[in-house]
Every structure is written in structure tokens, then in C-alpha cells.
């Protein structure tokens, strides 16, 4: 019997600001690195600086530019400097806004945190309809799941993974409070719910905001690979709570 195909979890290290952190992500085996184009973020870099850092990337590692309600002129100027960039929209952008950039993109979904909310039901955390959201942004290459906190970005918080819908017809990127210690559990809970799964980490591999730890990056990547190996060998370890 031919064994079932396995899926390697793709990894993005986000919020990079330094050459050594880009190099550490590459050496650890990350698939993508993220540069924050949102000026109020402590991890903000200019488009010019992002272009300098992106030039360190070898082939087949993707630079991702994160925007929050940015004007079209800012997006196009950044894309001109980094022609291979993939876009991440993390604000209040509409499907039309995302498509107007004319580049491959993923769209962040802000998942409510409140574990005790009366609106929390299986498949609808905090009343948020992820299935509809994914359909609304069906042109996106992926939907990134982040915790809904004040402002934009997940603030290093995790949401309740067990409340996600059991079947989302989309490529998902799990984000929000991931660390080397919890990413195995996150992958095991979320992967069976979607088409494919990737993970995105920022604060979980930092020394301070915008300053990454090479050791933590290596630990995170190793944990993701351990999750892949565990699920390939023992699919019953994948945990999906009953509906």
C-alpha cells in the first residue's frame, strides 16, 4: 500500500530588522521572512531597509512585506524595490484593496481571544466566521490566523485553537503567540482543519522587540519539524475535538 502523502509545515520568521537575524532564519531552514512596513510597530523597517535585508536571501526563500492599511503608493513603491515580495495585509483591507496591489498575498484574520465569551462555540471563536472570511478572501493564497488584541498584530497572544472550524477550505498560516514550547500542539490541532498549514512566529523567537535569537529560531524550527515527524508517524496524535 502506498503511504499517505505528508505535508511539510512551512515556516515564516516575521519582524526581522537585522542582517544577522535574516541569516539565522535562512540557516535554520525558514521558508519565508517577514518585514513590517507599519510605522507604529517596534519592528518597523523602511522599504529601503527591507530591500537591503531581502538581498541576503538565497533562492526559494520568500520575502514577505506586512502592511496595515497602507496607501497603494506605499505598497507599489515597496514592491518596486523588492520584486519577489509576497504581501501580507494585516489591517482593515477589503478583498478589492488586496487585489489592487496585483501581487500574491495572504490576509490576516483576527481571531477573538476571549475564552469565556458567550459567543464562543465550536467552529466560531468569539462569533468570528472563519469559513466565510476565507470565502470572502478566496483570492488570497493563504489566511493568516492571529489573535485579536487592541491595535494590529497579535501582541504575542494565542487564541483558542480548539474552537476553529473543523474544515476550512483554505491554506492557513497559524500565528499569534507561537513559541518553541507550544508550536507542536498548535500544528497538531490546526493542521487537520485546513488544506495546508504554515506557521508564523515573531515575538516567540525574540530577545527584545525586533531583535531575534538565533537559538530560539533554531529551537522553533526544530519543534516544527518534530511536529511534522510526529504526525507522519502517528496520525492519531492529531487532535480535533468533536463538533
Role assignments for model-derived ranges:
Residues 47-57, 98-100, 187, 202, ...:
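C-terminal helical cap(s) of enzyme catalytic domains, especially alpha/beta-barrels
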Residues 28, 81-82, 138, 189-194:
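Structural motif
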Residues 36-42, 48-49, 54-182:
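Conserved anion-binding
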Residues 173-192, 206:
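A C-terminal functional module that forms or caps the active site or interfaces directly
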Residues 30-42, 88-94, 148-149, 154, ...:
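Glycine-rich phosphate-binding active-site loops on the catalytic face of alpha/beta enzymes
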Residues 1-14, 235-243:
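N-terminal amphipathic alpha-helix/helix-capping segment at the start of soluble metabolic enzymes
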Residues 23, 76-77, 184, 218:
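Alpha-helical segments flanking ligand/cofactor-binding loops in enzyme cores
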